Amino acid sequence: VVSVIAALGLGRLISLPFSGPLSDKFGRRLSGIIGVICYAAYFMGIAFAPSMGVAYAFAIVGGIANSFLDTCVSPTCMEIYVNNPSVANLFTKFSICLSQFLLPFLIGIVASANMSYKTIFIVAGIAILIDGILILILPFPARKKAVQAKADKKKSGHKISPAAIAAILIGFTSSSTFMLWLNCNQELARSYGMADPSKIQSLYALGTATAILATAAFIKKGLKEINVLILYPLISTIMLALCYFIQAPFICLVGGFVIGYAGAGGVLQLAVSTTAEFFPENKGTATSLVMIASSIANYTILSLAGYITKVGGSSAPRMILLLNMAVTIIGILLALFVKKNRNK
């Protein structure tokens, strides 16, 4: 299972460098169709894979599918809701939260009916193909003509400013914050004497869903996205510090909700929206760049956490909290830099 998950990440890293530019050059529809076809192949391939090697190959295809849909969905939402692109992008995260909430119930229904585990994959494959038909026939928002875009590109030169690089790197730090917590909170809770750490996950999911709705409302009322990218990591840092110093089971429950809210509640999506401001005609590329940073975080930070777990013994969970705090603080500094230099 771990190898298949790793293959999904590999597929993303392989395809993200060109999925965004392809989306910008040939349109969001094509990127979406490629993503749908790859996802359908992934679901059916995993369901009927005769060996681990075949499953691994289809998992790479699944990672490719994910990157192409990323560079279709996020830019399209921002282009449909031009007055509230960040709010639109936040609701892509809300859709993910909703599916994560429903999936365990669907698995339970399949299990209670004594159906094969393949049922979930087959149903998902059919559902994504239906989505593909909708992508194929429904209208997409109009974009600038290629000639005008080319002229704009020549005029601006599309130079990547230091502020743009900082915005991209927030994809790394914001992903690290919630991934470290998500993968390491169970061990921390057990070390603090919690009998049932699984409760943390429920509060984490609740915090994430709450954050998306609340943040969307705050932004509509005038809160700037860049201020969210400063405030939410600051809240996460304070919460991580409390989890470090207060060695009691209840703090893990509080931390689950707060990190779900401030760490996973759309910060990555707002990083995409902020980066897209530096690439107004290349939102697909902007999405790719942030997601590449996120994918690198997924591999490097979790590998480092695994090493700490291996050598740290009983102190490892709290050492990982320190790592998480350090990375999250770097994210705050990056956001402050973007705020100060975004118009230069």
Which ranges hold each PLM region?
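Intracellular juxtamembrane helix-capping segments at the cytosolic ends
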Residues: 68-81, 265-279
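Cytoplasmic helix-loop-helix junction between adjacent transmembrane helices
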Residues: 58-94
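Helix-to-loop junctions at the C-terminal end of transmembrane segments
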Residues: 15-27, 211-224, 309
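C-terminal membrane-cytosol helix-exit motif in multi-pass small-molecule transporters
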Residues: 125-148, 331-339
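C-terminal transmembrane helical hairpin of 12-TM major facilitator-type secondary transporters
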Residues: 225-270
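Helix-loop-helix hairpin linking two adjacent transmembrane segments in secondary transporters
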Residues: 83-84, 88-139
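Conserved MFS/SLC helix-loop-helix module at the cytosolic interface between two early adjacent transmembrane helices
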Residues: 13-50
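Extracytoplasmic gate region of multi-pass secondary transporters
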Residues: 160-210
